[in-house]
Regions:
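N-terminal, membrane-interfacial amphipathic/helix-forming hydrophobic leader that caps
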Residues: 1-86, 90-91, 104, 177, ...
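Helix-boundary and loop/linker segments of multi-pass membrane transporters
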Residues: 3, 67, 99-109, 146-151
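Generic, low-specificity signal for short hydrophobic/alpha-helical stretches with a mild N-terminal bias
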Residues: 43, 50, 94, 98, ...
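Alpha-helical transmembrane segments and their membrane-interface junctions
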Residues: 86-102, 166-178
């Protein structure tokens, strides 16, 4: 009974925090605040840090690197895959004369946005605060993930699907503006977010912190949308798909089994 009560308290806690984020983000969007995206993601970071501070366990909540050598090693491998894949596609686009003009400051801004205000902000909030909090009470363990023998926790699954993946539908909704724009693309994005939310959660469990998931998250979004400015979103989505295929094929299993 006590365990059920603690689980309920944890769910209510993180649910309130996530609802608070969406209410603020929706409001900022409804008043058409300049740079509302930057402001809302800053608020997300503040909420994530506050959650970690309140529970007084920054290392357990992934804010402090547990194994920096591990993080840097697998971050480098990940970036090599994404960079080489991007270069290949950009090169082909160049010779086909399909490259779009883009200023350097736009590339720098996109890099900052996708790695810090999307990658870091969301990993801090979801994998740092929410996943860590839920794994304190939802501690049932699974023995493998996909084809890899690796033990991971139920709280990671709940976070990745219910608190990270499914809420992507809410990006198409704004109750303050009376807007509901649900398209097949939104549902496709939501399904992929549920899957990648669990993947990033499992990697966060393996690494012990949010650094590596942040790099992976940032690389995916920067390649899709940042590089997409240069080669077009259709081609950049294909490129991201290829990079993820290579990621799972070449390094994912080694990452989870690395004893370093």
């Amino acid at each position: 009974m006590e365990g059920l009560e603690e689980s309920f308290k944890a769910i209510v806690e993180v649910l309130i925090v996530e609802i608070l984020f969406f209410l603020v983000a929706w409001y900022l969007q409804s008043i058409e605040a300049s740079n509302y995206g930057w402001t809302s993601k800053t608020f997300m970071m503040i909420l994530g840090i506050a959650g970690v501070i309140i529970h007084k366990r920054p290392r357990e909540y992934g804010l402090i690197p547990k194994n920096l050598k591990f993080d840097l090693k697998w971050s480098a491998y990940t970036l090599i895959i994404f960079i080489l894949t991007s270069i290949s596609t950009i090169t082909v686009s160049f010779f086909l004369n399909h490259l779009r003009p883009i200023k350097l400051n736009v590339i720098i801004t996109d890099f900052l946005w996708f790695f810090i205000f999307v990658g870091f902000a969301e990993e801090l909030f979801f994998r740092g605060y929410i996943q860590s909090r839920l794994n304190e009470v939802f501690d049932r363990r699974f023995e493998s993930f996909l084809w890899v023998r690796f033990e991971w926790m139920e709280g990671t699954l709940i976070t990745g699907v219910i608190f990270f993946g499914l809420p992507h539908i809410l990006t198409a909704i704004n109750p303050f503006k009376g807007r509901i724009i649900l398209t097949p693309l939104i549902f496709l994005i939501t399904i992929s977010a549920c899957f990648m939310g669990v993947v990033l959660g499992v990697i966060r469990e393996r690494s012990g912190d949010i650094l590596l998931p942040t790099v992976i998250h940032g690389a995916i979004d920067f390649m899709t949308f940042g590089v997409g400015r240069l080669i077009g979103l259709a081609l950049s989505n294909i490129t991201t798909g290829i990079a993820l295929f290579l990621f799972f094929l070449l390094i994912f299993e080694g990452m989870l089994k690395d004893e370093a």
